[in-house]
Amino acid sequence: MTEQIPAPQPPADENSLIAERRAKLGALRGQGIAYPNDFVREHFAGDLQAEFADADTWTPDALEASGRTVKMAGRLMAKRVMGKASFAQIQDESGRVQLFLQGNVLGDAYTAFKGWDVGDIVAVEGGLTRTKTGELSVKASALRLLTKSLRPLPDKWHGLSDVEQRYRQRYVDLIVTPEAREVFIKRSKIIRAMRAWLDARRFLEVETPMMHYIPGGATAKPFTTHHNALDLDLYLRVAPELYLKRLVVGGLERVYEINRNFRNEGVSTRHNPEFTMLELYEAYATYHEIMDLTEQVIRDTAQSVLGTTQVSWDGADIDLAPAFRRWRMDEAVRHHNPEISAADCTDRDALLRHCERLKIRVKPSYDWGKLLLEIFEATVEHTLVQPTFITDHPVEVSPLARSSDTEPGYTDRFELFINGKELANGFSELNDPEDQAARFQAQVQAKDGGDDEAMHFDADYIRALEYGMAPTGGLGIGIDRLVMLLTGSTSIRDVLLFPYMRPEA
């Protein structure tokens, strides 16, 4: 059938359409039936399309002989009036189905239908049939208007062509863009699959505070708020890490949390000020076991949700089936920068010269560890297309990770990169309270030196470590970026229902 969705209109015409619809609503109010709320839905379009998909089996005669009747509701997405009979399409959360409407059956309801608009929400009851073109249809015996739509939907051919408008008016985007709906359905399935995977392995899901007295758990600038009753400044959490590790101290040996973090930083195709993370901790695991876990949960989630481990993301074909590469950070830097020697990697003066040569801007306070990271981010990160664990980060940029037993100045840490984007971060946790206190103190000095992303000193966390924390491995996976990977989305805003936007003027 040909859908009759209004074409794009200039503002004046749109206003006239809205006025026309408001007049129709006024007439409904006069009849006392503006927004009825007594209809109970029993069937969904997608379920019917799946059950009766075989047109050879479910012929019009077979459908009529089945005696099957349905009771459903949805948004009117198309209508074609042809005198005594009409066709329409309604859309619910599961899909669309066609309606076949007859004036001699519906009576006054058919007359009313002629005045309804695309976008209205309607209820229908009736049997099933199939048109000459083979399309499954509901042969309506009853029809009602449930909600009057006052604003016209975008043109079906162009949809919401303005990307910013899609983000601002996600409610419209979800109505008219099936691909957008599918992304968010997959997002829900991804999170559900990860929860099931962890629950099956004796991990306990927990909830930790969203407002912190002391911001910690990541090097990031926090959002600040104020508790009026206590006259106390609080911080939206940048990470749940320190609270989750307190739970490990308390004997909850496998814990995880899937929740929001907040970082007062820039907005880009990869970053949103609030974002979702999976963070977990497992006692008696090293960063090697946590890398194994990371690889397996991502691979199994892809297989569960997509039915495959092969995905396309931002122009790259990614295969999650083979073992993920594991590559030391200093080795990766030297591979991509032959001018940098092994000795240079821990030599601040040498790295400063390399940064100058590479035109990498750095701060005077950076030691060799931070300089090495800057060179990695500028010259290596974007080249990591297939899944790659970058391991053994410098202590300077890993304030919560355990120091390496064999490599002074390095830690037992990893980050997972896919197509040049960081998806996960993990390490063997630092459980030496004296070492942790010294690291916190170094962070405080960095903050005093102007680094507004450096951590605060958390005395209570040090006290918790003094009770003793078992050797522990930890992991954080960016859920938003994982959803980007598994849905092929190129912007984080495409996988957030309501991404951060500047307020409209």
UniProtKB/Swiss-Prot annotation:
Quote the record's binding site residues for Mg(2+) 1: E415, E422
Q: Which GO terms describe its molecular function?
A: ATP binding; lysine-tRNA ligase activity; magnesium ion binding; tRNA binding
Q: InterPro entries, from UniProt?
A: Aa-tRNA-synt_II, aa-tRNA-synth_II, aa-tRNA-synth_II/BPL/LPL, Lys-tRNA-ligase_II, Lys-tRNA-ligase_II_N, Lys-tRNA-synth_II_C, NA-bd_OB-fold, NA-bd_OB_tRNA
Q: Does the keyword Cytoplasm apply?
A: yes
Q: How is the cofactor bound?
A: Binds 3 Mg(2+) ions per subunit.
Where is it found, in Gene Ontology cellular component terms? cytosol
List the cofactors: Mg(2+)
Locations listed in the record: Cytoplasm
EC class of the enzyme, as a word: ligase
What keywords tag this UniProt record?
A: Aminoacyl-tRNA synthetase, ATP-binding, Cytoplasm, Ligase, Magnesium, Metal-binding, Nucleotide-binding, Protein biosynthesis
Q: Which Pfam families match?
A: tRNA-synt_2, tRNA_anti-codon
Q: State the coiled-coil residue ranges.
A: none
Q: Which reaction does it catalyse?
A: tRNA(Lys) + L-lysine + ATP = L-lysyl-tRNA(Lys) + AMP + diphosphate
Where does this protein hold Mg(2+) 2? E422
Please give the subunit comment from the record: Homodimer.
Per the record, the similarity remark reads:
Belongs to the class-II aminoacyl-tRNA synthetase family.
Protein name in UniProt: Lysine--tRNA ligase
Species of origin: Xanthomonas oryzae pv. oryzae (strain PXO99A)
